[in-house]
Regions:
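Non-catalytic regulatory/linker segments of enzymes
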Residues: 1-190
Length: 190
C-alpha cells in the first residue's frame, strides 16, 4: 500500500523505476551520494535541502522496496541498502549543518599536547541496527556524537579576514549535534 501511495503522488517514479538499471543492483554509498547531489543541484546551499533529501529518501525507499517485493534481493542485501541510505542521509545532514555553522562561527580548533593548534574532528557513531547495517523499513537510528576536545574555540579559516563570532568547541559541537538531529527529524517528518 505504501509503495502504491508514493507512486500515485510521484508518477515520475514509474518511468524511473521502469528503467532496467534502476532495479538491477544495489547502490553503493558513493552512488547514493552522487544521486542525491545530482537531485539537490542548486538547492544544496539552501534550507530546501531537507525537502530534497526527504524526496530522495522516499524515492530510494521505493526502489529498495520494489527490489525486495519483486524478489530481486535477499533480506540481507535489503537491510544493507536501507542502512546505506540512512548513512547517506546522515552524511548530507552533517554536511549541511557543518557548512552553516562554519560560515557563522568558523572551524573548531584545540591545542594538542605540544601546544600546536589543530582542527577538532567530529564523528557520528551508528549504534544498533544502523551500526550493524541491519536497518529495516521501520527502524529508528541510534547515534552517538563524539569530537576531539572540549577545549579550544572556533576561528575563521577564511583568508579574507571576514569577522565571525567565536564560540567554544563544546558549544560548537553541541550546536552541530542538535542541527543534525533536527535535520534528521525534518527528513523523516513525512
Amino acid at each position: 500500500q505504501i509503495l502504491t501511495d508514493v507512486l500515485l503522488r510521484e508518477p515520475s517514479y514509474v518511468d524511473w523505476l521502469s528503467r532496467p538499471e534502476t532495479l538491477e543492483k544495489s547502490k553503493s554509498k558513493a552512488m547514493l551520494m552522487r544521486d542525491f547531489y545530482e537531485m539537490a543541484g542548486k538547492e544544496l546551499q539552501s534550507k530546501n535541502i531537507f525537502s530534497t533529501l526527504r524526496k530522495f529518501k522516499k524515492r530510494e525507499y521505493v526502489r529498495i522496496g520494489l527490489r525486495d517485493l519483486l524478489g530481486k534481493v535477499e533480506f540481507k542485501e535489503t537491510v544493507k541498502d536501507i542502512s546505506n541510505l540512512a548513512d547517506v542521509c546522515l552524511q548530507a545532514a552533517y554536511d549541511h549543518a557543518g557548512r552553516g555553522l562554519r560560515k557563522k562561527y568558523g572551524a573548531p580548533f584545540y591545542q594538542d599536547a605540544n601546544a600546536n593548534w589543530k582542527e577538532s574532528e567530529f564523528a557520528i557513531l551508528g549504534m544498533g541496527k544502523l551500526g550493524g547495517c541491519e536497518l529495516n523499513y521501520s527502524s529508528d537510528i541510534d547515534l552517538i556524537y563524539i569530537y576531539t576536545s572540549n577545549q579550544g574555540e572556533t576561528r575563521s579559516t577564511d583568508e579574507s579576514g571576514s569577522s565571525i563570532r567565536s564560540i567554544s568547541n563544546h558549544e560548537y559541537f553541541s550546536k552541530l549535534a542538535l542541527e543534525i538531529s533536527k535535520s534528521l527529524n525534518e527528513i523523516t517528518s513525512e
